[in-house]
Swiss-Prot record:
Protein name: Acireductone dioxygenase
Enzyme Commission number, as recorded: 1.13.11.54, 1.13.11.53
GO MF term set: acireductone dioxygenase (Ni2+-requiring) activity; acireductone dioxygenase [iron(II)-requiring] activity; iron ion binding; nickel cation binding
Family: Belongs to the acireductone dioxygenase (ARD) family.
InterPro entries: ARD, ARD_euk, RmlC-like_jellyroll, RmlC_Cupin_sf
Name of the gene this protein is made from: adi1
Pfam families: ARD
Keywords: Amino-acid biosynthesis, Cytoplasm, Dioxygenase, Iron, Metal-binding, Methionine biosynthesis, Nickel, Nucleus, Oxidoreductase
Amino acid sequence: MKAYWYDNKPGDQREPHDSGRPVSEDYLASLGVIYRHFPELSDVDALAKERGYKNRDEITVSPATMGEAYEDKVKMFFAEHLHEDEEIRYIRDGEGYFDVRGKEDEWVRIRLVKDDLIILPAGIYHRFTTDNKNYIKAMRLFQEEPKWTPLNRAPELDENQHRKSYLEGLTATSIAAN
């Protein structure tokens, strides 16, 4: 895993867009983002049990598996959105980027590779893309039946209870740190 501030320069979303300014795991944790490196699937199983995750599936994002739909899917994943459930992804193969909004609404890019696991809290704005190799295989973990329901960023989402709870948690973390 490598995290850094996104450079916001125009260009292909699948390029690194590395500003040269690193972001620490502690900062990610302050956003509610949890990172782990799990070389063994048994570690993922233990985390799933601990967090009450009963279901999982695997998705391979590549032109070979998605055909003509690939470019549209990657664009859809890259649209800024949130979920009302936390999102857990375990990278089985390949590489990709999760971008999450920092405390000042700036993008933090998180590069994930094989055996990396990330947990994004409910209510955090984020987006995803493959890297320029156009291939990633990820396990998706779910507490209930597998579902992936993105809520694309819009002003009315400021009133979403999951978004409000997330922002309240950020405020509480900031106050506790001072």
